Amino acid sequence: YLRERGLTTATQKAFRLGYAPDSRNALKEYLASRGVAKEQIEACGLVRHGDDIAVSYDWFRDRIMFPIEDRRGRVIAFGGRAMSPDVAAKYMNSPDTELFHKGDVLYNFARARAALGKEQAIIAVEGYMDVIALAQAGFANAVAPLGTALTENQMELLWRVSPEPVLCFDGDKA
């Protein structure tokens, strides 16, 4: 999928893109085998419980994974794009946690801020793939909200680093 979208291996590595296998418990079992406590696994939002089942399951399955970083570049959550066309939610994010509130974060903010020159404005685009494609084309100053709307908190982040941010969203209703 990533090659079909024109992303080079170097770009994929730079953005630390990954894949969540189509398994209900691969991540849960891997983390447990590494000694991570069940409570920690659940607190980070990567493993969930269903309303009607007691057994936990991996939140992301059969998805391209996009690490979401805080303002300092530390991974605090993930976004995932479904590989199957039959999945209702094409994109989904980690649930809100103690560290992550999707309305307060912009994808690629730390990198974009570091790339800003004196004359550059920060560019806000619609999604992960837009940000990554722009970076590969030489525009490292792009960010994206983590949903269908740009929140007030996200706008404040933009204005902190760029007095005239450029908004470049798709023309569709999504």
Show which residues each predicted segment covers.
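Short acidic/histidine-centered micro-motifs embedded in hydrophobic/aromatic stretches
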Residues: Y1, G18, C44
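Non-catalytic interaction/clamp surfaces of large macromolecular machines
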Residues: Y1-K13
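Terminal amphipathic helices with adjacent charged low-complexity linkers/tails
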Residues: Q12-S23
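Phosphate-handling DNA/RNA-contact segment within nucleic-acid enzymes
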Residues: S23-P165
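Phosphate/diphosphate-binding loops
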Residues: P165, D170-A174
